[in-house]
Swiss-Prot record:
Its EC number is 2.1.1.242. Disulfide bonds: none annotated. It comes from the Bacteria. HAMAP family: 16SrRNA_methyltr_J. InterPro entries: 16SrRNA_methylTrfase_J, SAM-dependent_MTases_sf. This is Ribosomal RNA small subunit methyltransferase J. The gene is rsmJ. CDD domains: AdoMet_MTases (cd02440).
Amino acid sequence: MKIYLKFKSYNKRICKLLQLFKLEHDQNCSMGLLINHNSLELYNRDNVNQKPIKVDFTSKKNHYRCHHFRRKNEVLYRVSGIKNSYFPTVLDATAGLGNDAFIFSFLGCKVIMIERHPIVAALLKDGLQRGYQDKKIGHWLQTRLHLIVNDSLKMLEIPILQPDVIYLDPMYPFYHKKSLPKKDMQFFRQLIGHNYDSKKLLEVSRKLAKNRIIVKRPYYAKPLSEDKVNHIVTTRNHRFDIYQPF
């Protein structure tokens, strides 16, 4: 895939990632990848003031969320099905920047992320490699959070362990200004586009998961399926629809 490549400094590890995901320099591309010392960052060449995007499992936001974890306040704990010593295996079929997958792994679940876009996959792989080396989280992150580069619609064909839970957070259209995400995430959406196959992805997920499928939706959005939603958990801005497998 073609993208503008900018090197702030040479990094052998990141150069290997660029080769692995076949990312090649394109002088005319409006999106760029910045090799910023020890991290890979996506940035908007048309807006140099916009903050670059990177996957950082050691961020202050993640640290705060983990440090202040309370069962009743963490919605992913409530929808996951975790009970006592039971920690379900989770397949995140819409990995994005890996934020929710990281929380599932922090909670004790073994998580596999699937991502088909080579640029996003490179960002995730970079974040994982740095996270694995972190002194605070690396010891458990290495055993709980992993990435598969593939199309989620083909996950029935992937020879992986059948997960207990499949998690879906598909992109959805925004109908009014107040519902728009931050500018950096709007830019990220431009890269990966909308998920026009979300309903089909839910159908595939219900054929694979053992126990449940969790679909994250905005509070105003219609369910992905006309079938009955078995359970619903709501927050201020989102709704988590839980379906049973076929």
